[in-house]
Structure formats: structure tokens, C-alpha cells
A protein has these predicted regions:
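Exposed, low-structure sequence patches enriched in small/polar residues
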Residues: 382-829
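Short, ordered, surface-exposed loop/turn motifs in non-cytosolic proteins
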Residues: 23-25, 32-47, 66
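Short, acidic Ser/Thr/Gly-rich low-complexity loop/linker segments typical of extracellular
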Residues: 48-59
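A short, amphipathic beta-strand motif
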Residues: 23-31, 58, 95
């Protein structure tokens, strides 16, 4: 019940990325003369390689598991100061540096090239030698620890009732170096994995040996989020992808367009001369970082990096973000990652003054047993998934195992989080709160054995049924992890008819989707709806309806089997039998004017879906695609079986589609979908390609906003849907608008299709079986609509204005809409 919510929060970190306890220190460095903040001051733990320079407010934050007792601040022209620390806890240490005077001889200053540029050129030139992602092969072992903490804890949290239920959790309160505020741990996870990468063949594969997450019993599902592979932060890339936001890297080939660079120091660390380079963003119209990199002078390799997200960047829900990376020469002297750390504070408000409760997420990855250039084991090459959970129950490991695999011991507080979270889950108040949250996210109110819902279909209304009431449910994984049974009943006050449906899902494999689904329903449907359309019984489809829905009663039974052969290759096979009934909104008339009560269809179908390096989150019965940088291809073929049902038709239908999301930083990204198909044979209009209209004010990316239902049909067609999201590149330059952080979108959609004479029911003397509904025609002249949208309004809403560019003339039986305003809701970083 609460597990999906915890896994969802863990996924936010995954999407990015002793008994010695952690020593954390945060503070500000100022000038003793005037009290102003000092920028570029070097702050280090003496005797270690952990250090950073202060930002424009003079702020610094450091964290280490090394045993340290002092922190030191130094800057040319100021006296160095060293102050004591209390190890193993949070320290707030401010420095006030005193300027020193020293005499120098005559200095002649001449203009010249920034001394950083030759160093950066060397880094770019040597990326093939120093970037692990460009090596032929490598393998390593990873240990990943993620923690989710609650901060800005209000006094109400310490009320008498909460103290009675949760008082013991306040023993775990600590202070964050990221924000300087107290936090309460809410979740901790650990995983250990073997990571393999190859250039030929190109793949990156993670074999998770063990994983555990506090408070989650389904460790197989959780393990997919707790690994380290997909959270990589690679400063050698031109753009660093964190939470689906592409930040310009300071080591980007075109980094000078985004950053100003300063050579602030050179030093010797572990016998190697290191250049310390500070970088600041030139502008905040695109996602950028602020921080420093340390470059090895001999190899031009990145030795370490520390960066943060500056204030004012157009990013949602993240108040603070810190990235830390450390590299060392490893196998054969090649450079490799030693440690990565991502820390982020998630909040509804991004203002520092906000007192709203927020979450701090931290993800640390330690790398060991690095092997570069060695052959990948055959067993790994044969694996059919890029994330492989070795054990069906990866969380069933004793504490002794974790003590052996950790590169450092957890603090006593960290060890206690597991027991603390398990204790919290037995508190009734907690169970009630998480049941409510889980219901909002999943759509079902889960009892132990039955989930009741979806709640958004409990009540709705439409022209055909009037007021509709629906009650449904499905079994939970407590009943079975291999079989799920669901069903619903519904009743409409206008048609006074009982409807319903049911389904049985049988999952044969968790690692790869191999699932049989049986469904049956007697219910109303909107033929010709888009793939992302609000379902007919959704309350939002009723509220946002334009009033031109044209529903049909359908009896349908279907069986579908999906077989995923390997990661990225799936086939489908199934059979369908259905009967579609006429009504006053969707009449059925023969060419001689004789009405028809219904049409029948029986068909078998097969399909193929191909993707590459697609990230997929797998649950017992469902899976969620998290996207791919490569196009996704789908193919389908259907064959109608004549007389399998009384009056069913013989036909053949071939369809294909491709979806692609090219990233085009810094000017955003595009979403491109192209679909096409051909129907061979004579069929009634219900079995033609009914092009996707939109009967609501809700935006559907795979439907035409200005097109009505039953306006166009084809038996051969090609359609396209294109959006480009600029992520605020243009609006972010306007003085007043940029503070709103709105983001602009361009939209263009179109379809072209033809109808054979035997299927064209819109012409006089037609050979078709049925006449078309009034106003429905072929789209032999392409239909095109285009417009623009503004998203990120209040960080949630999007408004699109769409114009119909063709087929603008009135039609008999159709109210043509040449302009549409659509609303939608998007939760994006």
C-alpha cells in the first residue's frame, strides 16, 4: 500500500543521481574590514582532498566521512585561518578573514587569453582517454546508498498526538550541510551491484546483487530504483541529465557559451599538480550550474568536481541541488570514478524563506574493483535486460553481508533508520495517511486483499447515459503476485442500463513481461478517441467536455498475450470479438436508408515493439516506460475473420508507428510521433481508421484539438504529431515574464489519408455497407493544425492555443471548430 509511494520518492533520486560518522560543516566567509562576503575562498579539511571554494554569497558546505577535526579557509591577499570542528556531527563555522599587506615590484598587465581556456581545451581533447564512458570496456562494483529526509519540521509535528504516535522518531533528527537546517530521516536504501559497460557491442548493464529499502517489502520492485547505473553524473558529457533536466556541463565542448571561468589556484595533491577552476553561469535562461572543477595538469583528467544549482534557474520543485564527483587513476593508470554524490532539496516552494515542509534526498555511489579493457563475461553478454536483479528476493540479506560490502560503516543513526521506519509503519495514523496518499497516486483504495476504484470513475455524466455511477475493484498482490482479477459495474440514469466488465491478468515472469490478459465488457466507448484521451467514465472528461462526445455501446471480449523476448523486443498476439450498437448520436444506415442495429467484428492480431536502451520500471502486473534516447518502433497486423460472429467481416489491417524524443539542449526537446496504416477489404465505417478527435478542453498530444469525432476516416493514412518544448529559452529573456518561469511550446499536427470506393460511405451511390454519419468525409486533402502553448504556469498547468489551418469551411452536420484552447496538467522538473 505505502510501498509505491516510497518507491516513487526513491525514483526521484534514481532519476538524477565509517564507523566514522559523517562530519558536516557549513558557513560563510566574510572580510573583517567591511563584513562583505568573500567569493573564491578555498575551504578545505586539512590533510584531505575534500575542499571547495565559496560562492558569490561567501557560502560553503563540506561533508566527509574521513576523521577530521579542523576546517581551513585561505585566499590570496588574506591571512589563512584554521578553526576546530566537532567530528561526526554538523558544525556551523563562519570565517572572518583579515587582509594582509605585502609589497611587490612594478607589474605590467597586458591583455591576453583567459589562462583557463588552454586547460579546458586539453580536457576536451583528452576526453576519449579520460572519460570512462568512452573506454572500450570496463567493469566495477558499486555500492549505492540513498536517503530521504524530512526538513522544515513544524512545531505542529511535535503536538501531543503526534508525540504519542511518533515521539521516538525525533531521536534521529540531524542537520544538513546542504541547507543548514534540521532534518528527520524518512527512508534509507542500500544496494550493491556489478556494473558492466561495452562499446562494441554497445551496452551498459547492471547486475544488482542485493538491495534493501526501509519500509518496503517488495524488494524486487524497489531494487530497480536503488541501483547506481541510471543516476550517473558525468561531467565529461556536454549536458548532465538530472531529474530529466539537462544542465550544461562546465566541461562541455561549448561550455564557454554558458560559463565564465576563473583559474583560482594550483596545488599538489597526492603528488599530482592540480588546477582549481571556478565557473559561474553567464545567464540563467537555461539550466546551468555553479561551482568548481579540479583538473590534473599532466593528463587533463577531471580529478574532482563540486557544483550546485544557482538560484533563479528555471527548474521546478528543487530548492537546492549539489553534485560532487571524485576520480582517481585506477586499472592500467586510466582514470575512473571513486565517489559520486547528489543532494537535492525538494519543495513546493523554491524560496529559501519558505517554511513549508520539504524533502532532502541524498544519493551516494562508491566504486571499487575497477577493471578497464577486459572482456565482458559471456554470462553478462547473454543477459536480456540492462538492469538485472540477481535474486528474486534481493532484500533477504543479513546485516553481516552489508557490513562486508559497505566501503564505510554506517553511523548509529543511519543503522537505526531501518528499525525506526519499520516501527513507524505499525502506527495506525501512519497507515491511514499513506493509504490516502497511495490512493491519490494509484487510483485505488487498497484494503489488504481488494483495491476499490478507480475513484475518478465513481461518478460522471454524458449525453447518452446521463448521470453515471460506477463501482469497481481488483485484487491486490496480497492475494497473488501472478494473477490479478478485476471488475466493475455501472449504471446510467438516462439510458437506465446496467454495464460492466471484468479482467484477468496472469503474469508468468517478473524480469521480462510475459503476461496473458483476458477482458470482457459491456459498456459505452468513444470510437476514434486519442491514445491519451480521458476515458469515457472519467469525471474530468465530463467536467471538461465540449458537449460533442458521440458514445457507442460496445460488447467486447479480448485475449492478449505479451511476450518480451529481451529488453527492448516485445511481441503481442491476441484475438478480439465485438459488437458495436447504433444509437441516436451514432446512427447506422444502409445506402438504401434501412437502419442497422449493430455491426460485428472478429479478428486476430499480432504486434511488435522495438526499443533500445529504454528505461522501464516493472511492477508485478504493470510496467512504466521511463523513456529512451532512441526512437521506439511499433508494428501491428490484424485479420478479420468472416462469420466468426454473425455478420463479421474479412479484412486485413497493417499499422506502424515511430516515436522519438530528440534532446536539443539548450533549446529544449521535441516529441515526434509518426503513424501510418492500410486496411485491405470492405468494412463498415466503425472499423475504418477514425481519426483522433478531441471532444474535451483537455489537451491530448495524440489527438487533433480542432477535429470533431467522426469528422474524418481513412483506409490508408499517415499522421504526425510534433511538439517542441523550449524550456523557457525565449520567455526567460523577457524582463517581467522570466520571473514567472513560464515555458513555451510549439505544436503542429496533421493527417493525410484516402478512402477506396468500397469504403467511402460519404458519396452518392456508395458501394459501402453503411452510410457515414453526417459530415464525415475522407481526408484526401491533408488536415493540419498548429499552435503554441505556455507550460509551467504555477509549475503545474499548460494552456495551448491551436488553430485549424485546413478544412476550415463549414460542413453539413458538423460544427467546425477553427480555434481551440486546451488545458492540461504536467508535473515536471
Amino acid at each position: 500500500m505505502a510501498q509505491r509511494t516510497l518507491i516513487f520518492l526513491a525514483g526521484l533520486l534514481w532519476a538524477a543521481g565509517a564507523s566514522a560518522q559523517t562530519t558536516r560543516v557549513r558557513g560563510q566567509v566574510t572580510d573583517t574590514a567591511d563584513g562583505k562576503p568573500l567569493q573564491f575562498v578555498s575551504v578545505v579539511f586539512p590533510g584531505t582532498t575534500t575542499g571547495i571554494t565559496t560562492d558569490e554569497q561567501g557560502i560553503y558546505a563540506l561533508e566527509t566521512r574521513d576523521t577530521v577535526s579542523r576546517v581551513q579557509a585561505s585566499m590570496v591577499g588574506y591571512a589563512t585561518r584554521t578553526l576546530p570542528l566537532t567530528p561526526g556531527t554538523f558544525n556551523h563555522v563562519d570565517f572572518a578573514l583579515e587582509a594582509v599587506e605585502f609589497g611587490i615590484g612594478q607589474v605590467v598587465i597586458t591583455p591576453g587569453e583567459n589562462p583557463v581556456y588552454p586547460i579546458l581545451d586539453g580536457v576536451i581533447r583528452n576526453k576519449p582517454l579520460n572519460d570512462p564512458e568512452r573506454y572500450d570496456t570496463y567493469s566495477c562494483r558499486t555500492y549505492t546508498k540513498m536517503e530521504l529526509d524530512l526538513t522544515n519540521i513544524r512545531p505542529q509535528f511535535r503536538s501531543r498526538r503526534l508525540q504519542r504516535n511518533f515521539g521516538f522518531v525525533f531521536d534521529y533528527v540531524d542537520t544538513s550541510a546542504l541547507t543548514g537546517q534540521a532534518y528527520l530521516p524518512a527512508m534509507i536504501s542500500e544496494s550493491t551491484a556489478d556494473l558492466y559497460r561495452s562499446s562494441r557491442p554497445a551496452f551498459k548493464r547492471e547486475v544488482i546483487r542485493a538491495s534493501r529499502i526501509s519500509g518496503v517489502e517488495d524488494n524486487f520492485a524497489a531494487a530497480q530504483f536503488t541501483g547506481g547505473m541510471h543516476g550517473d553524473v558525468n561531467f565529461y558529457d556536454n549536458f548532465i541529465d538530472i531529474f530529466n533536466v539537462r544542465f550544461a556541463s562546465p566541461l562541455s565542448d561549448g561550455g564557454r557559451a554558458f560559463y565564465n571561468y576563473f583559474l583560482v589556484d594550483s596545488m599538489v595533491t597526492e603528488g599530482r599538480k592540480i588546477y582549481k577552476i571556478r565557473f559561474h553561469p553567464k545567464r540563467l535562461t537555461t539550466p546551468v550550474l555553479d561551482g568548481e572543477v579540479n583538473i590534473d595538469s599532466a593528463s587533463y583528467a577531471l580529478q574532482s568536481a563540486s557544483a550546485r544549482m544557482p538560484k533563479g534557474v528555471n527548474v521546478n520543485w528543487i530548492r537546492h541541488l549539489m553534485l560532487d564527483n571524485e576520480n582517481r587513476p585506477a586499472d592500467k593508470g586510466r582514470w575512473f570514478r571513486v565517489h559520486d554524490r547528489v543532494s537535492a532539496e525538494f519543495s513546493v516552494s523554491t524560496a529559501d524563506s519558505s517554511k513549508l515542509t520539504s524533502f532532502i534526498g541524498t544519493r551516494e555511489v562508491a566504486y571499487s574493483d575497477v577493471r578497464i579493457g577486459e572482456p565482458i563475461p559471456d554470462e553478462v553478454l547473454r543477459m536480456d535486460n540492462n538492469v538485472v536483479v540477481r535474486d528474486e528476493e534481493p532484500g533477504h540479506r543479513r546485516e553481516e553481508f552489508w557490513e562486508q560490502v559497505r566501503p564505510y560503516s554506517l553511523s548509529e543513526k543511519e543503522k537505526g533508520i531501518y528499525a525506526m521506519v519499520d516501527s513507524v509503519q505499525h502506527v495506525p495514523l501512519y497507515r491511514n495517511i499513506y493509504t490516502l496518499i497511495n490512493t491519490v497516486i494509484v487510483g485505488y483504495w487498497n484494503t489488504k486483499y481488494i483495491g476499490i476504484g478507480p475513484y475518478y470513475k465513481l461518478a460522471s455524466f454524458n449525453k447518452l447515459e446521463g448521470f453515471r455511477m460506477q463501482l469497481g475493484g481488483r485484487t491486490t498482490t496480497e492475494v497473488s503476485r501472478t494473477v490479478r482479477v478485476g471488475g466493475y459495474v455501472a449504471y446510467g440514469t438516462r439510458d437506465e442500463e446496467v454495464k460492466g466488465g471484468g479482467s484477468v491478468e496472469v503474469a508468468f515472469n517478473r524480469h521480462l513481461t510475459r503476461k496473458l490478459t483476458l477482458t470482457a465488457r459491456h459498456d459505452v466507448m468513444q470510437l476514434g478517441a486519442g491514445q491519451n484521451a480521458l476515458t469515457e467514465s472519467n469525471i474530468l472528461s465530463s467536467i471538461l467536455s465540449r458537449g460533442d462526445q458521440r458514445l457507442s455501446m460496445v460488447n467486447r471480449g479480448e485475449a492478449v498475450y505479451e511476450h518480451e523476448w529481451c529488453h527492448g523486443v516485445s511481441t503481442f498476439a491476441g484475438a478480439r470479438m465485438q459488437r458495436i450498437f447504433a444509437n441516436r448520436y451514432v446512427p447506422m444506415l444502409r445506402p438504401d436508408g434501412v437502419p442497422v442495429n449493430s455491426v460485428s467484428d472478429a479478428a486476430v492480431h499480432v504486434g511488435l515493439r522495438l526499443s533500445k536502451n529504454e528505461t522501464v520500471y516493472r511492477m508485478p502486473f504493470d510496467k512504466q516506460s521511463m523513456g529512451s534516447v532512441y526512437p521506439i518502433l511499433t508494428l501491428g497486423f490484424s485479420a478479420g475473420i468472416p462469420d466468426a460472429l454473425h455478420g463479421s467481416y474479412e479484412y486485413y489491417r497493417l499499422e506502424g508507428g515511430i516515436r522519438y524524443r530528440p534532446e536539443l539542449p539548450p533549446v529544449g526537446y521535441s516529441d515526434i510521433t509518426v503513424q501510418g496504416g492500410r486496411i485491405f477489404g470492405k468494412v463498415p465505417y466503425q472499423l475504418l481508421k477514425l481519426h483522433e478527435g478531441n471532444g474535451t478542453y483537455f489537451y491530448d498530444p495524440y489527438a487533433f484539438s480542432c477535429m470533431n469525432f467522426y469528422e474524418f476516416a481513412s483506409d490508408a493514412w499517415v499522421s504526425w504529431f510534433w511538439e517542441h518544448h523550449f524550456n523557457g529559452v525565449l520567455l526567460g529573456r523577457l524582463p517581467l515574464i522570466k520571473k514567472l518561469k513560464w515555458r513555451e511550446v510549439l505544436v503542429c499536427k496533421g493527417v493525410w489519408g484516402t478512402l477506396s470506393r468500397e469504403n467511402n460511405g460519404s458519396t452518392a451511390g456508395t458501394q459501402a455497407d453503411l452510410l457515414f454519419p453526417a459530415g464525415m468525409t475522407s481526408v484526401s486533402d491533408p488536415y493540419v493544425e498548429a499552435g503554441f502553448g505556455v507550460e509551467n504556469i504555477f509549475r503545474l498547468f499548460r494552456v495551448d492555443c491551436i488553430w485549424r489551418l485546413t478544412h476550415r469551411s463549414p460542413k453539413p452536420g458538423q460544427e467546425i471548430q477553427n480555434f481551440a484552447v486546451n488545458l492540461s496538467l504536467h508535473l515536471k522538473f
